[in-house]
Regions:
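Signature aromatic-anchored transmembrane alpha helix within multi-pass, membrane-resident enzymes
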Residues: 1-10
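C-terminal luminal/periplasmic domains and tails of membrane-associated envelope-modifying transferases
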Residues: 10-16, 23-206
Length: 206
């Protein structure tokens, strides 16, 4: 029976996390309750772990018109059809934001409409684009982007943080890369968490 204890504990912690609210959901709910609709928000797109806020229809149209991928820009292209369906949806929410996506570099070849328009990791560029808030997750908050993080913390105010970890753990980045977009597997990562999701911080630019 003793050999079953580790597996049992792992299952217990996994089930406990699955029943808890994800930090991305917490972040989404906080933003919609505390940040005015129509505000300009830069979402950290250095990884696939950001809250799915709704883009304004105007920016969806503008993004598609500027989306220079001939394969999808043709009248019969799948992207064109998708955008038309999206914009004609009578249930498209009115409570939307001006969303830009933070990238380390902007590629003109491998682009996705769902991550457009883009903005570089540069504070001057963010101000030029009228960004009011930045939502950063644990990849951007790690030492890999130290230079930009220092600029961000100097030029903004931290207004809210959402952490999946128990108090006192003091960790930002997970122990395993698979935890960035899915559930953790290692026992330590499971037991250290209160909920699924990444560390997320909301900054208000000065």
């Amino acid at each position: 029976l003793l050999f079953m204890v580790p597996s049992g504990l792992r299952i217990y912690h996994s089930e406990r996390l699955f029943l808890a609210e994800d930090t991305r959901t917490q972040c989404y709910d906080w933003i919609t309750k505390n940040i005015a609709y129509g505000s300009a928000i830069a979402l950290d797109a250095t990884g696939p772990v950001f809250p799915r806020l709704k883009q304004t229809k105007e920016l969806v149209e503008e993004s598609f018109s500027n989306f220079n991928n001939p394969k999808f820009a043709t009248p019969e292209g799948s992207m064109s059809y998708k955008v038309k369906l999206l914009l004609s949806n009578p249930d498209y929410p009115e409570d939307t934001y001006r969303i830009l996506y933070l990238r380390k570099k902007i590629s003109r070849k491998n682009r996705f409409l769902g991550l457009y328009p883009e903005s570089l990791l540069d504070m001057d560029e963010l101000r030029r684009q009228g960004i009011e808030y930045v939502v950063a997750h644990n990849i951007l908050l790690s030492s890999y982007y130290k230079d930009f993080l220092e600029q961000l913390e100097e030029g903004s105010v931290l207004v809210k943080e959402f952490s999946p970890y128990k108090p006192g753990r003091g960790r930002i980045k997970p122990l395993e890369e698979s935890s960035l977009a899915a559930a953790p597997f290692s026992f330590r990562e499971l037991s250290d968490r209160e909920r699924p999701g990444p560390v997320l911080r909301i900054y208000r630019l000065r």
